[in-house]
Amino acid sequence: VYLGGAWGSLFSHAGKGRYRNHRLRVPYPMHVNIGNPMPSNSQTHEVRLAVQELGSAYHEKAGSQKGSLSTAMIRSARQFWRQPFVSDTTDKRLTQGKALISSLLLRDRLKEELNAEDEAVGILLPSCVGGALVNFALALDARIAVNLNFTASSQAFDSAIRQSGIKVTITSRAFLEKIEIQELTDRVIFIEDLGKDFSALDKIKTALKARLYPMPWILPTKCFDRTRTASILFSSGSTAEPKGIKLTHHNLMSNVEAAMEVIPLSSRDGVAAALPFFHSFGLTGTIWL
């Protein structure tokens, strides 16, 4: 028997201290998953494996009802609109609401620069507010984010571009001056240009969208498919040609949910982006957690 949903309930030890940080929900949703009968002489590891398989089936079914990264971001922003969300060492600070508005503005500006063939888009940015917003904007436009490893060798860097098929890269002029990258894609979009000339009317209209519009009015239909690829990560390529891993929305959300079960984070906590966004933990643990 596997009990689904017990972690996070009022009587669980999720959070910092029992009975804290829980919103009382009545009735509280629980799932009881019953497997096939097992012999009374079953070994401990066999029982454990059977329970784990039931748990996997539960999370697979529960995950299919939670939407994609795009829908999760909008739901979270609307629920915690004024909560601090992202900041960096340049003293840029955004709440969840402002981050969503900025991401939607950035997405709409990127639509003018990208075409239908640009399904995968390269990102060459450090761990900063701008880098996070670009990842959010691409997710909100149903595109694939490819965070490129700017510490890799030129051969590994070029291989990642070739394998992912990206034709355009989003970067920063200031950042390019600090790193040793010889060649990029044929088309380069600078984030400094994307953030210019947003009118007050654009900001007001986007704020209303972010706060009030139904999700189907904001997001492309593809954004509701959690089986679509959300990001491509590459190995470092230090010992062989870099290997690319396609991560779906389901993959990333499952990793986030697994992390939340062992890391008792609350709205009062922050996560330091000690690892870059081209790193598996940097992507999952600091952008989407």
Model-identified regions with their sequence ranges:
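Conserved AMP-binding loop of ANL adenylate-forming enzymes
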Residues: 120-123, 263-289
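Conserved AMP-binding/adenylate-forming core of the ANL superfamily
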Residues: 84-119, 124-136, 153-158, 208-209, ...
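Short hydrophobic alpha-helices that are characteristic scaffold elements of the AMP-binding
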Residues: 136-142, 162-163, 279, 288
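Conserved ATP-dependent adenylate/AMP-binding module captured primarily in the ANL superfamily
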Residues: 135, 150-181, 198-203, 207, ...
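Conserved pre-ATP/AMP-binding loop-to-beta segment of ANL
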Residues: 82, 189-234, 240-241, 261-270
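A cross-family acyltransferase "interaction/gating" segment
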Residues: 1-42
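AMP-dependent adenylate-forming
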Residues: 71-96, 229-232, 239
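Conserved structural elements of the adenylate-forming
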Residues: 99-105, 212-214, 245-266, 274, ...
